[in-house]
Amino acid sequence: MAAWGRRRLGPGGGSSRERVSLSATDCYIVHEIYSGENAQDQFEYELEQALEAQYKYIVIEPTRIGDETARWITVGNCLHKTAVLAGTACLFTPLALPLDYSHYISLPAGVLSLACCTLYGISWQFDPCCKYQVEYDAYKLSRLPLHTLTSSTPVVLVRKDDLHRKRLHNTIALAALVYCVKKVYELYAV
């Protein structure tokens, strides 16, 4: 499998322009080398193996799989942010609006927060890709050995701890659920 374009970068694997030396477990490059009919499947397999190996940086040269991965991460980020913002709106709307009208905004916002949190939990929570973010910072990208690539527009993923992020949106969504159940009970049972 090493002959299929996989390269690990370790000390001395980059150039003298690097400001930080990377160990062999820091960076993995999915090279765009077409060696048969199933090259796209091989790229996906290499990416999956790199994600499961938990490399700090993953550089994806193949444009199609890089764009798909970046979109997948963007959708997950959107679900997370929507869950947090809608849950926050659900919880703080009763403080800002009169009580007679606040439930018209807070209940739909709470349901939206719960829906996004549930969808994130089902589709993204156990995906190894959710531990990564797409890196756009030019300074951080300059520290990586991108000069060895054949692609001019690689997608660079950086591994980040998402434990606090998941706790935040789960806590806010749970609080929104409690508020919504309480409010529905007050509106219809009393």
Curated annotation (Swiss-Prot):
Show the InterPro entries listed in the entry: TMEM11
Major subcellular location class: mitochondrion
**What are the transmembrane regions?**
84-100, 107-124
- Please give the GO cellular component terms listed in this UniProt entry: mitochondrial inner membrane
Kindly state which keywords UniProt assigns to this record, in alphabetical order: Membrane, Mitochondrion, Mitochondrion inner membrane, Transmembrane, Transmembrane helix
The UniProt subunit note reads as follows: Associates with the mitochondrial contact site and cristae organizing system (MICOS) complex, composed of at least MICOS10/MIC10, CHCHD3/MIC19, CHCHD6/MIC25, APOOL/MIC27, IMMT/MIC60, APOO/MIC23/MIC26 and QIL1/MIC13. This complex was also known under the names MINOS or MitOS complex. The MICOS complex associates with mitochondrial outer membrane proteins SAMM50, MTX1, MTX2 and DNAJC11, mitochondrial inner membrane protein TMEM11 and with HSPA9. Interacts with IMMT/MIC60.
Q: What is this protein called?
A: Transmembrane protein 11, mitochondrial
Organism of origin is Rattus norvegicus (Rat)
